[in-house]
From Swiss-Prot:
Broad class of the protein's primary localization: cytoplasm
G5: annotated span: 602-604
Cell compartment(s), UniProt: Cytoplasm
Region of interest: G3: 512-515
A GO term from the CC aspect: cytosol
The protein's name: Translation initiation factor IF-2
Keyword Cytoplasm on entry: yes
Length: 959
């Protein structure tokens, strides 16, 4: 089928008509118009074509309208004529390239399908002239009005994309073909390997079956020899008969699993179907068919068949049982025979329960053997549990309990026994005993010997000591070029600060100690951990009590002293007075003929600081300070606190060895793994050598200031030492409380006699040293009547648990340089618990002293008024006995306290109820006058008794 288009306008020649020139764009055709009654008429129709085009497609010229579409069969005949006209028609009829100027010379039919417009061809079929005339052929001479059938850019792009996609698909198909070939080769290799494995397994199975058949044949021969001869003859006669009903030569309905039957099995006599079937199950390792199994209802039928054979005169065949074949290790675990299990390479493996039972059986057999007793050296502490003793002896705790039961003691593995009982048990079981004390766990941690060849010089540790406000911290600030005083509350140091400075390329470690009287323990710790002590004395204040105390601490620690006479810039400074005052305390400076170095400095104006540092280096050079940096670290805890963000933080001074992150150390009763090391400038360091102060993070708890620490080998050792020290601390606390209170009877008597009152407190501070100083200061405030009772103290902020404890013990909460969190504040407000914050120890001690003074009972003071002698005693109705007296000394006041003295013995003390002169009540009666007196609730008065009158005053006391 060809479409008629006007792409090429040519002249057409009709042999029946004259030669005419067709108008461009107009096509004439003749059609037959039908009328009624079969009449027709030829009508000339002119078709004028219009060309419509859109921006995204090429303009096309519509074909002439036709009354009916052309037949499909006419397309192949008209194709040669219309091939040059339409590219789409040419592509539809043959896979030849269209005569267009396109980059691709060839294109398959599928990619060019979107270019053709079949709906145009269907709507505009080729016009057929009447009488079988063909359409006019194009005239190449006339080109007027012609429209070239060129491809638009979008169609060219579509064809180009189709070609590229076809090429991509071709590459992908080629790659898939290569992969498929590779996979097919691997599959063939795998199948060949499987066939080889199957053949090998089949050969092994055949060999095994042959061996089993041979063993079975030998067993049958032995059984046949043991059977009597008549039965054998009857059996041979019976072999001629066919097999009984229900016996099948082979299992037709059961799969054989691909196992070949053993060929060439030796037979006795003629072939016997029944024995073959009976032997098939043991050979193949699977149960017999249901038809061959003896069921409960089949025994009578078998007996009937045997009786029928006997009646017919034929000897009954005796039942021959197959010999029992002992299964091997593989057959025991084979189980049911199936196709899956038969085709698999390996049989069923032993289960975990079977393996466990086998191991337990082996262990029991080993335990039944008599083993040689091993004698061990058992280390026994002061107390030990039965379980721990059994582990150390490598014995069962059950055996120890049985032994104790024989001795009449019922005990459990967790019970604790003493060292003597443990020694008896160990010796009874044949072990030797080594008795140790609990304190032995600490042996060796501080006794590590230094390697003399590895000793190197270390920086000196210098402690700055002196009286409060003599300028210790200011001097250290001037040396460090920092300002620490402004950070201390009240301008006084309440912590131990450790720093390092560099002078002439050499490091010096400084420890600043508080000078307040409450911080005696801190100064003592600072003196013990130092090499050199700098005694700071103000030139305008001379020697003070804490100065003397610092001198005593330094002498007790055996460290040399360097005197720094500070504040020489003041007008009232008198350094010579300081030197003279030091002579009274056996401190002889060089200017006075001694060996103690003294330097006049001014921390405020930074005068002579270099001389002071040079004196320190000179003294350190004389001491020849050395340490081994390669050994495990040891040192002392200078300060400890509980930081909210970092946990327990301990400021330590390394004295020996080098400390690294990850080391396990014990500090007092606490232990932990070092998570980080922070120097005095807040920088994280990888290691801390000798004489270096650092902060340690990672301890399980907050140690006490002054505790020694040491690095141990493992966590078990550290935990053991820490538990021992905690237990020791608890025992000391109990002993201290029991010593202070005594027995219950003594405590009750003391309360009744003295009436000691307690002021409960919960103290929370920023560092452990401050808490220790506060506790010691409050202990000194106590008297026989009142004392401060520290319910709880610790480093860290105030929490809800502290408030709950204070509420239970009716205590007040004191926070020193710490604050309570919001939950604790809300809880304290609800429960009415008072929380007081302090940052200066002076104010804290003064307030606690005032509060404790309020608990003191007021002082009772008596003032003598006068004496009166009883002259006569009168009995008055409704009043009682009234004494008629004369005032002999002083005066007597109404409502005053009186004592009745008889024979110089006080027999009554009370109050005066009435005082009358004649019949009038009077306030007082002076000396020399007579009066009448009556006592409250007392009538035993006699003539001649003396009445002593006095006034009682209650005066409040203070501590």
């Amino acid at each position: 089928m060809s479409d008629k288009t006007n792409d090429d306008k040519t002249l057409s020649v009709n042999p029946k008509k004259t030669l005419t020139l067709k108008r461009p764009g107009v096509e004439q055709s003749t059609v037959r118009q039908n009328f009624s009654h079969g009449r027709t008429k030829a009508v000339v129709v002119e078709t004028k074509k219009r060309k419509f085009s859109r921006p995204d497609e090429k303009p096309e010229v519509e074909a002439a309208a036709a009354p009916k579409p052309a037949a499909p069969a006419a397309a192949p005949q008209q194709a040669p004529a219309s091939a040059p006209v339409s590219a789409s028609a040419a592509q539809a009829s043959a896979p030849q390239p269209a005569p267009v100027k396109a980059p691709a010379t060839k294109a398959p039919a599928a990619p060019s399908a979107p270019v053709t417009k079949p709906h145009v061809a269907q709507q505009r079929p080729v016009h057929q002239r009447p009488g079988g005339q063909q359409a006019q052929r194009p005239r190449p001479a006339d080109r007027s009005g012609m429209v070239l059938n060129t491809l638009s850019r979008s169609e060219m792009d579509a064809r180009r994309r189709a070609l590229e996609e076809a090429q991509i698909r071709e590459v992908e198909e080629r790659a898939r073909a290569v992969e498929e070939a590779k996979r097919r080769a691997e599959e063939d290799a795998r199948r060949a390997k499987e066939r080889e494995e199957s053949a090998r397994r089949q050969a092994e199975e055949e060999a095994r079956l042959k061996a089993e058949a041979e063993a079975r044949r030998k067993a049958e021969e032995e059984a046949a020899k043991r059977m009597p001869q008549p039965e054998a003859r009857s059996e041979r006669r019976d072999d001629a008969r066919p097999a009984p009903y229900g016996a099948r030569p082979q299992q037709a309905g059961r799969p054989q699993g691909g196992r070949p039957q053993p060929a060439g099995r030796p037979q006795q006599g003629s072939p016997r179907p029944a024995p073959i079937i009976a032997d098939a199950a043991p050979i193949a390792g699977k149960p017999l068919p249901q038809s061959q199994l003896r069921k409960p209802g089949q025994s009578d039928d078998d007996d009937d068949r045997r009786s029928d054979a006997a009646r017919r005169g034929v000897a009954a065949k005796p039942e021959v049982r197959a010999p029992k074949v002992v299964k091997g290790e593989d057959d025991r675990r084979r189980g049911k025979l199936t196709l899956t299990s038969n085709l698999e390479e390996e049989g069923r493996s032993r289960s975990l329960s079977a393996m466990r039972r086998r191991q337990e059986k082996f262990k029991r057999s080993q335990m039944q053997e008599t083993r040689e007793k091993i004698s061990r050296e058992v280390t026994i502490p002061e107390t030990i549990t039965l379980q721990e003793l059994a582990q150390r002896m490598a014995e069962r705790s059950v055996d120890i309990i049985k032994y104790l039961m024989k001795q009449g003691q019922m005990m459990k593995p967790g019970d604790v026994i003493d060292a003597d009982t443990a020694q008896l048990i160990a010796e009874e079981f044949g072990h030797t005993v080594k008795r140790v004390a609990e304190s032995d766990v600490e042996e060796g941690i501080f006794d590590v010997a230094d390697n003399e060849s590895a000793m190197v010089s270390r920086p000196p540790v210098v402690t700055i000591m002196g009286h409060v406000d003599h300028g210790k911290t200011s001097l250290l600030d001037a040396i460090r070029h920092a300002n620490v005083v402004s950070g201390e509350a009240g301008g006084i140091t309440q912590h131990i600060g450790a720093y390092q400075v560099v002078q002439n390329g050499q490091k010096i470690t400084f420890i600043d100690t508080p000078g307040h009287a409450a911080f005696t323990a801190m100064r003592a710790r600072g003196a013990q951990a130092t090499d050199i002590a700098i005694l700071v004395v103000a030139a305008d204040d001379s020697v003070m009590p804490q100065t003397i105390e610092s001198i005593n601490h330094a002498k007790a620690a055996g460290v040399p002293i360097i005197v720094a006479i500070n504040k020489i810039d003041k007008p009232a400074a008198d350094p010579q007075k300081v030197r003279t005052a030091l002579l009274q305390h056996e401190v002889f400076v060089e200017s006075m003929g001694g060996e103690v170095l003294d330097v006049e400095v001014s921390a405020k104006n930074k005068i002579n600081l270099d001389k002071l540092l040079d004196a320190v280096l000179l003294q350190a050079e004389m001491l020849d300070l050395k340490a081994d940096p390669d050994r495990t670290a040891e040192g002392v805890v200078i300060e400890a606190q509980l930081d909210r963000g970092r946990g327990s933080v301990a400021t330590v001074l390394i004295q020996k060895g080098t400390l690294h992150p990850g080391d396990i150390l014990v500090a007092g009763s606490e232990w932990g793994r070092v998570r980080a090391l922070v120097n005095d400038r807040g920088e994280h360091v990888k290691e801390a050598g000798p004489a270096m102060p650092v902060e340690i993070l990672g301890l399980q708890g907050t140690p006490q200031a002054g505790d020694r620490f040491a690095v141990v080998a493992n966590e078990a050792k550290a935990r053991e030492i820490a538990e021992y020290r905690q237990r020791l601390a608890r025992d000391k606390a109990v002993a201290r409380q029991s010593g202070a209170r005594g027995s219950l009877e003594q405590m009750m008597n003391q309360l009744q006699v003295s009436g000691t009152k307690e002021f409960p407190l919960v103290i929370k501070g920023d560092v452990q040293g401050s808490i220790e100083a506060i506790t010691n200061a409050l202990d000194k405030l106590g008297t026989d009547e009142v004392r401060a009772r520290i319910v709880h103290s610790g480093a860290g902020g105030i929490t809800e648990s502290d408030v709950s404890l204070a509420e239970a013990s009716n205590a007040a909460i004191i926070g020193f340089n710490v604050r309570a969190n919001k939950q604790a504040r809300d809880s304290a407000e609800q429960q009415g618990i008072e929380i007081r914050y302090y940052n200066i120890i002076y104010d804290l001690i003064d307030d606690v002293k005032a509060a404790m003074s309020g608990l003191l009972s007021p002082e009772r003071r008596e003032t003598f008024l006068g004496n009166a002698e009883i002259l006569e005693v009168f009995n008055i109705t409704k009043v009682g006995k009234v004494a008629g007296c004369r005032v002999t000394e002083g005066k007597v006041e109404r409502g005053a306290g009186v004592r009745l003295i008889r024979d110089n013995v006080v027999i009554h003390e009370g109050k005066l109820k009435t005082l009358k002169r004649f019949k009038d009540e009077v306030a007082e009666v002076p000396s020399g006058q007579e009066c009448g007196m009556a006592f409250e609730n007392y009538d035993d008065i006699r003539a001649g008794d003396v009445i002593e009158a006095f006034r009682v005053e209650h005066v409040s006391r203070t501590l």
